[in-house]
């Protein structure tokens, strides 16, 4: 795959997806690690209600990563992109971000871009 923010590969067994990414800018990768970071960047979870999960994450001390979300989505934060996907990143433990989506990602059986 090649997008404005990253290039890389998606691997899946139909249930679990792994994205191997090379970020194109520090803003998209998150400035604390930058585009040259090598290692675990984020975990993604498909959820039923992004708003409810977002509230729970923030209440647990995981703020929304507006810097990364805006770099990825520009002015379309929370709107459908990349074939209909919507995802939002939050700060997670040990600097590893948490990514949530209602529609899933390319490769997941339930991926439904709702375009």
Model segments located where?
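Vicinal oxygen chelate
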Residues: 9-12, 31-115
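Core segments of cupin and vicinal oxygen chelate
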Residues: 1-24
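Generic short beta-strand segments
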Residues: 23-25, 69-70
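A short local loop/turn or secondary-structure capping micro-motif enriched for an aromatic residue
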Residues: 26-30, 106-109
